[in-house]
């Protein structure tokens, strides 16, 4: 049923799967469950559990408040989506998100806002488009970008050459078949120069913070683990490629802060030890 829905080429995978469920189970609420993006993601998690850890039992927890991507919670429960929080932050700063975040972390948000330690999305969009334009040299400049298929490299190049804003770029790329979220990831991968040489799975564990008494839990992990990226870089070729990609993304993010920061912040970041 799913193959039949995908064959017409007029819908994305999530919509095709929902239509297939409706065709197989008409008159049931199953298809309606797949209206929610997070429920589609849950299906993928359950498939992975069946394949990798069939003894594990997933426990579904209904989402309260706003759904994924909704502006604000439609009911009295004060839970906002991440998209809504970002928009509130951009228009009103830390105080605007105060009703929707834990009271204990609000001082940290206020401190970050005062210091300009947050993304300026206008700057980020222009920086991304500038990087993409700089890569428009030679034939099929985006052919090697990670995740490119079905001629998307040509569509991306045309969109980059014609667009003057990041929103225009995403509008030009997005179709029923190519959802905006996927095109946003594709454009960023292209801007940062990510190709299929990047490991498909994480080759290391970058330790950002922990409780000291819990560090012993890491002794049996199968991957290299460290808080120091340069130490991880020396582990093997896969780690070196991933560290380079991580630093590229970190430096891009630092430049696109409200108050831009210099390169190399990820190399200077010290591990955070939790005390509570």
Cite the ranges covered by each PLM segment.
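Active-site cores that bind ATP or allylic diphosphates and position pyrophosphate for catalysis
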Residues: 1-276
